[in-house]
């Protein structure tokens, strides 16, 4: 079972505000308090961005002993766009370095459904988009591995 860092919007002004486990220290407290082999952290990297947190800092603060799953996507730090990595404002060089530093070996879920919005249903275009997502994922994985060997 994985718990995820979350946010919500203030109902009065629409601003993004913290929700459960948005803060990495709080997230650590919850995981450590339950102290169960069945509860792990799923760090949503895009949620780090929209809550004005540095994803690399969150990764290092939580460590590989807690983080066993990632939701990997990019955004503009204003909206939870769920677009493909390297198409927004996230710093993927520092993220892949941090993942290497904690020797990350968990799940890597590319959660970039927003990348497909507006593409229509043309199978050739969708196939090319999927191939691009695969190439970006492979690049991120290579970057993590290359940083581990340094």
Task: Say what each PLM segment does.
Residues 12-13, 21-150:
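Histidine-acidic metal/acid-base catalytic patches
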Residues 5-18:
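Active-site-proximal beta-alpha loop/turn segments in soluble metabolic enzymes
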């Amino acid at each position: 079972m994985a718990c995820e860092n979350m946010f919500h919007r203030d109902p009065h002004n629409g601003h993004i505000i913290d929700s459960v486990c948005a803060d990495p220290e709080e997230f650590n407290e919850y995981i450590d308090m339950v102290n169960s082999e069945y509860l792990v952290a799923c760090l949503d990297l895009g949620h780090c961005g929209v809550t004005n947190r540095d994803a690399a800092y969150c990764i290092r603060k939580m460590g590989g002993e807690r983080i066993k799953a990632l939701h990997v996507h990019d955004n503009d730090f204003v909206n939870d766009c769920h677009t493909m990595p390297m198409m927004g404002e996230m710093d993927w060089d520092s993220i892949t370095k941090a993942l290497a530093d904690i020797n990350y070996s968990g799940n890597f879920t590319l959660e970039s459904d927003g990348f497909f919005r507006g593409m229509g249903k043309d199978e050739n275009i969708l196939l090319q988009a999927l191939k691009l997502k695969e190439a970006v994922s492979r690049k991120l994985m290579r970057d993590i591995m290359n940083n581990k060997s340094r």
